[in-house]
């Protein structure tokens, strides 16, 4: 059989892994991998038991040690069940909200959740549910691409007294306020418009309005019952559904697919963010960055931010509203690779309480060694929180010295890469593929390869010098210090220091000499 769902008579089979991968992890988890050990550590604060798989045969042959393996398996089952208990309220609320079985809900994507919710509401409104698109329709839809969301590229540098504003539920608000729906489209001389709400209120905006109102109601109740897990789950599910509508309308396999609607939502989103920028600059403030539904404004006080918000909100249609996301002490934007302009979606902030918020840097990416992530995070913390640039530079030099002296634990040198297909299916052999194939262990799509770069032999490529972390640890194989210094640590901090006027030579102590130095 080709079925991928397990049916157990009299039992509901819930696939927690798929639910976490498709829905929960997208907004809630920071872990680099969805292995049980990592997910349990983040959600429960507890990890799997250690077990030496290389000795499993010997352990099972001896009755006195077989219980070790049993306890290991029991702990895995216990962790999985406790994760399920944490997620049950969320699963139950989605199930009730869209009218589908828990077994099916646990395997759905966000788009499927949104579609089932619309179908449920459509039946209530006595409307006709469109058919699923044919294969030819899907192929035709795939050829059409909308212009993306608005991004105002930042200027690299460090800024102080930054205010961040964002639209509350921007895309859902646009759909409602402009009555955007496949049923309300009006084609006027090649342009697209939408019927006024006074003529007909579209199905999609009416459903969205009910979702937003239900979420407001649930949040209000939650204030009086802060420990009510059902209400917490309901708020999360309604947010998931509301935010999923925009992506759903542009999803090629959707029943209510509407290319024009998705394009209109994006265009109006760009227009409203541009209006915020124009108004802020008109009032004499500098906008340093804007992205999708938010804007970063420098050298502005909280009082000035509140006045700006009030002025802009007075011009917005209901239910659109611009909110103050926060006021921050300092912000740092780095250059895009090989460009003078700043990198998009890559910045770090220090809030009023001294907390560091990092977006887009290696500290939040899975394909860098922990030593690079830790070094970068500490550099950002010293610069933004402590305002100590020289201290940050000294710290990096100490890390480089520790790596060169092999004082850094092997655990911090491990690099994790998730496979998109079976290891044997890759045409080009990258570092992680080489490590996977040379180990003799079978790695499939979705698996995470954990490996290190070793010194190896002269003439070997980096790929040839990559081996699985477990093999390196078991055989006491050393990492290659120069690789981790030059390909991990220095690249992770160089862009930060360059913005502040430092070069790679300032970090390594090896400055390039000019003719004037002789």
Residue ranges of model-derived segments:
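Catalytic nucleotidyl-transfer cores of nucleotide-processing enzymes
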Residues: 1-9, 21-23, 131-132, 136-249, ...
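Short beta-strand
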Residues: 286-290, 324
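Low-complexity, acidic/Ser/Thr- and charged residue-rich accessory regions of DNA metabolism proteins
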Residues: 436-518
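Common nucleic-acid-contacting/processivity interface regions adjacent to the catalytic cores
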Residues: 57-169, 173-176, 229-271, 275-279, ...
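Hydrophobic alpha-helical scaffolding
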Residues: 26-29, 70-73, 107-108, 160-164, ...
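C-terminal polymerase-core module
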Residues: 298-469
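Active-site-proximal helix-loop-helix substrate-binding element of RNase H-like nuclease domains
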Residues: 1-77
């Amino acid at each position: 059989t080709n079925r991928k769902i397990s049916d157990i008579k009299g039992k509901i089979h819930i696939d927690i892994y798929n639910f976490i991968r498709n829905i929960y992890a997208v907004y809630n988890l920071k872990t680099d991998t969805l292995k049980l050990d990592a997910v349990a550590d983040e959600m429960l604060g507890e990890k799997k038991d250690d077990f030496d798989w290389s000795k499993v045969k010997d352990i099972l042959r001896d009755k006195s040690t077989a219980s070790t393996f049993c306890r290991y398996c029991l702990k895995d089952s216990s962790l999985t069940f406790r994760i399920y208990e944490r997620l049950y309220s969320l699963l139950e609320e989605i199930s009730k909200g869209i009218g589908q079985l828990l077994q099916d809900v646990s395997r759905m994507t966000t788009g499927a959740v949104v579609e089932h919710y619309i179908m449920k509401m459509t039946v209530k409104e006595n409307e006709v549910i469109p058919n699923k698109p044919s294969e030819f329709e899907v192929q035709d839809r795939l050829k059409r691409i909308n212009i993306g969301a608005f991004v105002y590229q930042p200027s690299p540098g460090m800024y102080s007294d930054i205010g961040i504003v964002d639209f509350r539920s921007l895309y859902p608000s646009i759909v409602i306020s402009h009555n955007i729906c496949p049923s309300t489209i009006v084609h006027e001389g090649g342009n697209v418009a939408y019927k006024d709400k006074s003529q007909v209120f579209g199905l999609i905006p009416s459903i969205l309005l009910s979702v937003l109102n239900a979420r407001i109601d649930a949040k209000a109740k939650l204030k009086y019952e802060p420990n009510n897990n059902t209400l917490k789950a309901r708020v999360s599910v309604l947010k998931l559904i509301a935010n999923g509508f925009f992506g759903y309308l542009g999803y090629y396999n959707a029943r209510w697919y509407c290319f024009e609607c998705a394009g209109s939502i994006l265009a109006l989103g760009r227009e409203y963010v541009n209006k915020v920028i124009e108004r802020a600059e008109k009032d004499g403030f500098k906008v340093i960055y804007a992205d999708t539904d938010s804007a970063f404004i420098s050298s502005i006080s909280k009082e000035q931010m509140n006045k700006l918000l009030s002025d802009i909100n007075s011009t917005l249609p209901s239910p659109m509203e611009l909110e103050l996301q926060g006021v921050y002490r300092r912000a740092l934007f780095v250059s895009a690779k090989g460009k003078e302009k700043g990198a998009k979606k890559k910045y770090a902030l220090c809030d009023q309480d001294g907390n560091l918020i990092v977006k887009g840097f290696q500290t939040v990416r899975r394909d860098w060694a922990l030593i690079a992530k830790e070094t970068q995070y500490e550099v950002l913390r010293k610069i933004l929180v402590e305002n100590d640039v020289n201290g940050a530079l000294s710290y990096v030099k100490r890390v480089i010295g520790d790596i060169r002296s092999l004082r850094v634990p092997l655990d911090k040198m491990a690099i994790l890469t998730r496979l998109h297909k079976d290891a044997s299916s890759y045409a080009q052999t990258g570092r992680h593929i080489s490590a996977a194939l040379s180990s003799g262990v079978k790695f499939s799509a979705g698996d995470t390869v954990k490996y290190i770069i070793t010194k190896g032999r002269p003439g070997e490529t980096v790929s040839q010098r990559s081996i699985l972390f477990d093999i390196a640890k078991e055989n006491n194989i050393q990492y290659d210090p120069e690789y981790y210094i030059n390909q991990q640590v220095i690249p992770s901090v160089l862009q930060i220091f360059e913005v502040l006027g430092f070069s790679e030579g300032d970090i390594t102590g090896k400055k390039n000499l000019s003719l004037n130095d002789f």
